[in-house]
């Protein structure tokens, strides 16, 4: 829904306002778009679109092409536009055959020369593209991914470290005379792990 702030108001309303269950999902892969009258011709082959089975719209991060070459913006960087496509118009490629994380339903889809109206595209993370301004939408989407993923990783690391410290109170390795917590090597490694975890947390928050 962060993309709602860069979409045209009527498009944002169509996706997230008119439908209480409206949602947008996307994933990585190869995607290109060529400007045509009133919009873009999109060709893509995308995968790992987590949440796509629950979404009502899908996104495709397309490299913009001009004469077959990537377009460059004023900053010299390749122009990438996110195309917003109704899920009802695509066929899901079932590729998410996994043991873990099955519920994410991270399947994919492909399109060839598919027309997307100009209004159904956005450029993410550019202040000048915002159609709705609020402090929340100045936070970059890449930072949302980073904070979300790293927060989970640090939570797992913290739980594992606490579990190990609890284990070390009574655990005595075979042939050892003392429990783990009395071992100076273990003490040093736990201290290093604590320091690294705290440093990562400080880096993320600060």
Q: Residue locations for each model-derived region?
A:
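A generic structural signal for well-ordered coil/turn residues at beta-strand boundaries
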Residues: 29, 54, 79, 86, ...
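Glycine-rich flavin
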Residues: 1-55, 70
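Short Gly/Pro-enriched turn/cap motifs at secondary-structure boundaries
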Residues: 21-24, 98-102
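Helix-rich catalytic cores of soluble enzyme domains
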Residues: 40, 46-49, 60-64, 114-115, ...
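C-terminal helix-coil-helix/basic helical segment that borders enzyme active sites and/or dimer interfaces
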Residues: 199-206
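Glycine-rich beta->alpha junctions and the first turn(s) of the following alpha-helix
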Residues: 99-197
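Short helix/loop capping segments that flank catalytic or ligand/cofactor-binding pockets
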Residues: 43, 50-52, 92-94, 118-121
């Amino acid at each position: 829904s962060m993309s709602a702030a860069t979409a045209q108001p009527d498009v944002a309303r169509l996706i997230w306002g008119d439908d209480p269950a409206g949602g947008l999902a996307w994933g990585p892969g190869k995607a290109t778009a060529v400007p045509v009258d009133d919009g873009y011709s999109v060709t893509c082959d995308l995968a790992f679109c987590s949440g796509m089975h629950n979404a009502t719209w899908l996104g495709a991060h397309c490299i913009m092409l001009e004469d077959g070459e990537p377009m460059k913006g004023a900053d010299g960087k390749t122009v990438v536009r996110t195309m917003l496509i109704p899920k009802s118009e695509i066929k899901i490629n079932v590729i998410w055959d996994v043991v873990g994380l099955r519920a994410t339903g991270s399947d994919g889809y492909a399109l060839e020369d598919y027309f997307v109206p100009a209004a159904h595209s956005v450029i993410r993370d550019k202040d000048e593209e915002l159609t709705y301004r609020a402090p929340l939408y100045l936070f970059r989407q890449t930072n949302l991914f980073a904070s979300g993923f790293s927060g989970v990783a640090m939570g797992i690391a913290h739980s594992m470290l606490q579990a190990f410290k609890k284990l070390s109170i009574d655990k005595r390795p075979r042939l050892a005379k003392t429990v783990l917590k009395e071992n100076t090597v273990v003490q040093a490694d736990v201290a290093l792990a604590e320091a690294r975890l705290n440093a990562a947390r400080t880096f993320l928050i600060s």
